[in-house]
Every structure is written in structure tokens, then in C-alpha cells.
Amino acid sequence: EIFGYYLVSKLQTIVSISVTSVDQLFYSEFILSISNPSCIYVFDLEGTDGTGIMEISPQLALSIVERLLGGNTETTRKPRTITPIEQAVMRGIIEHALADLQTAWRSIAELNFQYSRLETEADFVQIAPSSEIVVVISFDVNVGMHSYLMNLCFPTFALEDVLTRLNRQQISTLSVQSPHRMRENMA
């Protein structure tokens, strides 16, 4: 949501971002689902031993770049590898997206999302073994009249400590509230 507001202000057009699904897949299944060429932004999950992926369609990247450089988002192009100039423009957008993601996660855990690199071919990205389970959060990104896909991918081993801490917080919250709720129910 925060990133959507940022894009609205930068692109000066209507932008909406919504979660379409949250899935657990084998890493190999996720990689096979990515078309080539693509825009695969790899980032470090500082505070864990893991690395994550923000994968966006090249059409979305091209649409953002075109709009930022004075064009409109109504043009559609065939997917292609983005140029070094387009990569430089998108890097700032992606770094801002990662900062917004970090803000969104702050209520759950203190994680730092640090941009690492861009890959355009899925075969060159190895953040986990093929048989590792990953969490994939899929988003629908609407820019103007066009809809694009964006995915976040986290290996489960990178989130284990976070999930353990989250479960402990939920349990302690429940145990603190339980006696109070019991009294209310007895009255």
C-alpha cells in the first residue's frame, strides 16, 4: 500500500497494488514460473541468513521508466531485457519499494531489505536449493489502464526465526488476555 502511494506520486497516474495470493512452493516451481526475460531483483534479508526476490514483469518496469521519463503508460511493448539506463532508473524505484517493504514488516520483525542485484534470466538466480520451500506473495499492480504482476519470494529457512518470534508473541499475548476474558465470560 505504501509503495502504491509512492508510485502514484512519482508517476502522476492512478496506481493500485493488491495481494492476489500467498503460496508455498518448491523454489524450482517458482523459478520455472518466471518468464524470460524478466526483472528479478535480488535482495538480502539482513538479520537472517537469507536472500529474497522481487520479480516484476518487464512490461511493468518499462511502463514505470517510460512514465518517469515523460511518456505515458498507455503504450504496450513486447517483453524485452531492460537496458542499462532503464536498470539505473528502476534501481531507485526498487530500493524505495524495499524500504517500504521493510516498514511494512516492522510490526512483525526488524528486518532490513538490502538491494543486491538485478537478474534478467531466472536460471541465474539461486537463493535456495531447488527442493526448498519458499513463500511467494503475488501482487496485481494496476498502472493506469494496464495490469501487471509482481511477486515476492522468501525462502522459509530465512523466515524461521521471524516466525518463531511471531508465534511466541502471539502465545504470550493470548496467555495475558485469557484470564481477563475468562472473568468477562463468568460475569
Regions found by a protein language model. Name each.
Residues E1-A187:
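N-terminal auxiliary interaction/assembly segments of multi-subunit proteins
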